[in-house]
Structure formats: structure tokens, C-alpha cells
């Protein structure tokens, strides 16, 4: 039931004070004026509280249970982050206030930028992008600006591996590049010979995730970087999987020129359901002049915004990023420290490999090498034997109170699950997950229809996902309309 269906004429939740603002007689154009009052639901405060409390109880979250969503790093978000981000000094300021009264916020963002540069091995960084894909687009615009500044107008191609995130080719295309797909080698990694075939004087950039989306570290990354640079192209780092290498190595040390980070993954800020996220973009020195405006600078112990950058790609959004998310990431990094962040990477890899070995006794691992933070498993054999698909297993997991792993991605593996346990899960949780998974496989063999018709315990069972995607209903339809 929606909030509109609870509406009853005359019910009120809050009485607004009388309007004492003088009418200055602004003459707005007719096309900007509302023709009729908004159709707001008329409900009591108790109705509202019960409605949204019940909806919240139906949600699944990291605070509820295991959330092994591959390539998403659904780690626990420490509550100290929330506590400090809610301090009045952060929540009651506005971006339009003069810098004299926002020095604390500016200092926090400046220091966060410096810390992220150190963690990633970059020379400069912007915190403005609102999400990972927004960071990707920003990085691609920087790559384009770099080549155009050199008069290198032929470079219109972006190489993207076939195992890459779907946002990689989308971001490259939005920036005006032609996307060229690079086929993975038999081991799931970049094949240097195959890469050489695609590199020429029309290639602007190669986009990579390392570890890649199969959870495998690109062992030839130094050679890859040298090869890309030899041909005059740039190397771009998708930071989705940075969690695995924290404190061990840095994208900048591998030879990457541009990197975007996902604060809502690696640095424990909440994510899911569309945001808010944060996708800072770091660059090496030769690309710093192209970073978007404004940039945060420090002059004589005063923090301020600098808009005077003649070769900048310009504005990429209003104001300066999702500030409250930046506060949470700052708190996380300060709390963990260098040793703590290194331990994060170690435990993420340890948990993933422990779970990989356990799951390998239930279904095949697509690439059986030691993984980093995640791995890809396939139930293709079970599907051929019983007709039970990865989607069915994912739905059945919901009945056992576990969020399904990422399914059918990467696209180069059939009937697959991409599983990322993160560093914050205990051995007990991982053992319980494998017990449940094993039980579902037994169910699939003994009673396939049971699994094919799951879930049974969720408020909504199987959605018509195709219709929801192609014909979304984004507003309430009143009967008289």
C-alpha cells in the first residue's frame, strides 16, 4: 500500500505556521507557475511513522544480514561515521556561505583529498563526482581534454576489457569515445599480445579494474602500462576493487594516469538504492590542470575554492560533491589509519579465498586461481542437470535471509555468481552461507520446482523484471486521471 492510499480528507500530521513573508510581487512567467495545488497525501503523523517503519522493516541491508554482492563491497558501515557526520557543524552549513565561516569543512575536504592521493598514488584529486560512474565520466573527459590539448585529434577510441563493469563503456561513449572491446585471455586476465593488436595512434585510453571483475590481479600490469604509454594512450583505473589492495600497492605505482575511487565501497560510506555516493577522481601531475572546478587549495593556512583554471574541463555538478559522504570517508580513514587499511585489504582477500574454497565443493569456480577480494562461481552444470538457474538459486537464498550475490556478471561466464564477502564478515557467517548454499543445491536436485518458484517468505515474490525495466511506473496513478 502506498502513502496515497492511506490518505483521508482532513487528516493532518503537521500545522505550518502562518506565512508572515511579505509579498514582493515577483512576476513569474505563466509556464513556471503551478496550475493547481500539489496532491499531497492527507495522513496523520502516526500513519506516516507506521507506514515508513513497516517499509523499512521489509528492506534488506548490511545491518540485517550477509550481503555478498560481488563488485559492490557491501562492508559494514561503522556507526561512528554516522555520529560524526551528523554533527551540527557539518549539517547546518551551506555551500554558499563565505569561506570564513566554513574553514572546518574546507579543511576536512582538503585533508581527505591529500589522504586519498596518498592511498591511490596520485598527485592531485577532485572530490566533486557524485558516484563511481560520474567519476568515470569525469576521468574520460579529462582524457579527452588531454589529447585535444596536444592537438591529437585522432584519438577517439577507448579500449574496454570484456569483463569490465558496464559503466566503463557507457562513460567512455558519453565522453565521445568509440568503445573497442578487448577479449580476456584464457586465465581471465589481459592478454598482452591481444592488447598490442588493438593499440594504435587512434586509441586514447585503456580502462582497467585491478583486481579485475573476476577477482584476479593483473600480474602484467607494469608491462601493460608501459605498452599503453608507448603508444601515446592513457591508462585509467576503475577503483571499484581498490579494497583488495589497500596498503599493499597503489594504482599510481602500477602506472595508471587517472583513477576514480568509490568512497561508498572501499571507504565504508552507505550505498545502495541509488545513492548518495561519491567517486573522487585522482590524476598524475601532467593531468592536474584538467581537473574540474572548483578545486580546494590552501594558501597561508586559509582553505578556499579556486575557479581560475583555464584548461579545466569545467563544472561537472553544482557545488562540491556529496559532503556528508566525504565526512564519513574521512572519519573511516582517520579511524583505521595506515595499519588498519592494510589489514582491511588482507582480510578481504583472506575471506574471499576461504569462501572460494568452501564454495568450490558445491559448484565450479570459473577461474580457480587464488583470487583477491571476490571470485566468480558458476552453476551451469546444475542448470543442465535440473533446469534450476542462477536466478532461481539467488531467489531461494532470500528465503534463508541472505542477499543474493551478483548474478550473470561478468557476461563472459554463464549462470554465474560474483561473490564478495568483504573483510567485515566472520568465519561463522561464511560457514553458514556455504551450508545454506549446499542445502539449496540439494533441494534443486531433489525438488527442482521448489527452487524454481522461490522465494516464498519475501513481501513481494518474483517481479516482472523485464516490464519494470522497459515500462517503469514512476508516479502514483490517481483513479480519476
Curated annotation (Swiss-Prot):
Which GO molecular function entries does the Swiss-Prot or TrEMBL record give?
Answer: glycine binding; glycine dehydrogenase (decarboxylating) activity; pyridoxal phosphate binding
Subunit = The glycine cleavage system is composed of four proteins: P, T, L and H. In this organism, the P 'protein' is a heterodimer of two subunits.
**Which gene is transcribed and translated to give this protein?**
gcvPB
| Similarity remark | Belongs to the GcvP family. C-terminal subunit subfamily.
User: Mind listing the UniProt keywords for this protein, alphabetically?
Assistant: Oxidoreductase, Pyridoxal phosphate
Q: Name one GO cellular component term.
A: glycine cleavage complex
Report the SS bond pairs.
Answer: none
Q: What is this protein called?
A: Probable glycine dehydrogenase (decarboxylating) subunit 2
* Listed EC numbers: 1.4.4.2
| Alphabetical list of HAMAP family matching this protein | GcvPB
The taxonomic lineage of its organism, from the top, reads: Bacteria, Thermotogati, Thermotogota, Thermotogae, Thermotogales
* UniProt catalytic activity: N(6)-[(R)-lipoyl]-L-lysyl-[glycine-cleavage complex H protein] + glycine + H(+) = N(6)-[(R)-S(8)-aminomethyldihydrolipoyl]-L-lysyl-[glycine-cleavage complex H protein] + CO2
Cofactor(s) required for function per UniProt: pyridoxal 5'-phosphate
Q: Quote the InterPro entries the UniProt record gives.
A: GcvPB (IPR023012), GDC-P_C (IPR049316), GDC-P_N (IPR049315), GDC_P (IPR020581), PyrdxlP-dep_Trfase (IPR015424), PyrdxlP-dep_Trfase_major (IPR015421), PyrdxlP-dep_Trfase_small (IPR015422)
The record's Gene3D superfamilies line, in alphabetical order, gives: 6.20.440.10, Aspartate Aminotransferase, domain 1, Type I PLP-dependent aspartate aminotransferase-like (Major domain)
Q: Which organism is it from?
A: Thermosipho melanesiensis (strain DSM 12029 / CIP 104789 / BI429)
Pfam families, sorted: GcvP2_C (PF21478), GDC-P (PF02347)
Q: Which residues carry this modification: N6-(pyridoxal phosphate)lysine?
A: 265
Q: What does this protein do?
A: The glycine cleavage system catalyzes the degradation of glycine. The P protein binds the alpha-amino group of glycine through its pyridoxal phosphate cofactor; CO(2) is released and the remaining methylamine moiety is then transferred to the lipoamide cofactor of the H protein.
A GO biological-process term: glycine decarboxylation via glycine cleavage system
